[in-house]
Amino acid sequence: MIISGIDYSLRSPCVCIFAGLEKESFTFNRCTFYFLTDTKKYATFFLNNIHGERFQDWNQDFQRYKSIADWTMDKVIGSEQIAIEGYSMGSKGKVFHIAENTGVLKYKIYNTGIPLEVIPPTSVKKFATGKGNADKDQMHQQFMRDTGIDLKSKITPDKTKVSNPVSDIVDAYYICKFLYDKIIENYTRS
């Protein structure tokens, strides 16, 4: 089984790809992560399965949306199923830009025929922590409990709070795990 979880954004999109058998448990080590960043020091490899890459240069918004969607499609192609975090209803700022950006990706996924599951952000947070309004720090704390890995100390040790790309990796992990658990639940029912 190859499935993907996407934490999609304009500033730091992240993809988590799980490759394993239905009988194998979902673990951090069976996942590969890819994220985009504007920060040069994050455009590198971490922990053997996390890949940071720089954004492509762009001159207009649609060019940016296309390059992010193309990058994401390059990562998820070959997946049997994909999950993406839905829109946050409390979003502020460039909500139309976020919607246009995400729409380009959803259209590209639709054209491949790969099933796409859209998961509300509150469902991802509740799945991970038991609280639908968990913040980035709470999500990271739960990730550390579940995996034994402190991404903040490995990737952003100079930051005082959990931020990009750590929060995006954590979110993508739980989006992918949410999809995995749903697939396994349906598999065991049939």
Regions found by a protein language model. Name each.
Residues 1-190:
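Phosphate- and other anionic-substrate recognition elements at nucleic-acid/protein interfaces
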